[in-house]
Amino acid sequence: MSTDLFPQAHSKHDLERGFALAPRFNADGLVVAVAQHADTGEILMLAWMNAEALKLTVETQIAHYFSRSRNELWKKGDTSGQLQDVVELRVDCDQDAVLLKVRPRGDGGACHVGFRSCFYRVLENGVLVEREAPLHDHA
């Protein structure tokens, strides 16, 4: 799927080795987005972006995403104060996923349930175990 905001790659070579940002949005008009802490390398969250979210992220250098559950654009941290300053944006080899290297503001968290990372649980012997304390209570 192509959009008016980004060019379409004209060849496999352009897609994989070209110099234009030409994201391959899925049938729902989305690409997967991984947010990684720019300083520690910790994976903070996985989300989705539509063309508008990607455009705003590129223009403002602040992470914007698309909420599939709310069906709306969302500027990460607008209500929580956990804005994500984008230090670097990468695409994968076929441009259907983006990696945002970010520096979180506020309390440094990214997870809506109060943790620094959305990946706060580890599977140990078939049971999920919380490996970190929440930054704040999510009530």
Curated annotation (Swiss-Prot):
Positions that bind Zn(2+): 93, 111, 118
Annotated keywords: Amino-acid biosynthesis, Cytoplasm, Histidine biosynthesis, Hydrolase, Magnesium, Metal-binding, Zinc
Gene Ontology CC annotation, any one: cytoplasm
First-level EC class: hydrolase
GO molecular function: magnesium ion binding; phosphoribosyl-AMP cyclohydrolase activity; zinc ion binding
Cofactor note: Binds 1 Mg(2+) ion per subunit.
Intracellular or extracellular location(s): Cytoplasm
Record pathway: Amino-acid biosynthesis; L-histidine biosynthesis; L-histidine from 5-phospho-alpha-D-ribose 1-diphosphate: step 3/9
Binding sites annotated in the UniProt record for Mg(2+): 92, 94, 96
Gene3D superfamilies, per the entry: Phosphoribosyl-AMP cyclohydrolase
Catalyzed reaction equations: 1-(5-phospho-beta-D-ribosyl)-5'-AMP + H2O = 1-(5-phospho-beta-D-ribosyl)-5-[(5-phospho-beta-D-ribosylamino)methylideneamino]imidazole-4-carboxamide
EC number per UniProt: 3.5.4.19
GO biological process assignments: L-histidine biosynthetic process
Family note: Belongs to the PRA-CH family.
NCBIfam families: PRK00051.1
Subunit and interaction comment: Homodimer.
Function field: Catalyzes the hydrolysis of the adenine ring of phosphoribosyl-AMP.
Protein name as annotated: Phosphoribosyl-AMP cyclohydrolase
Native source species: Caulobacter vibrioides (strain NA1000 / CB15N) (Caulobacter crescentus)
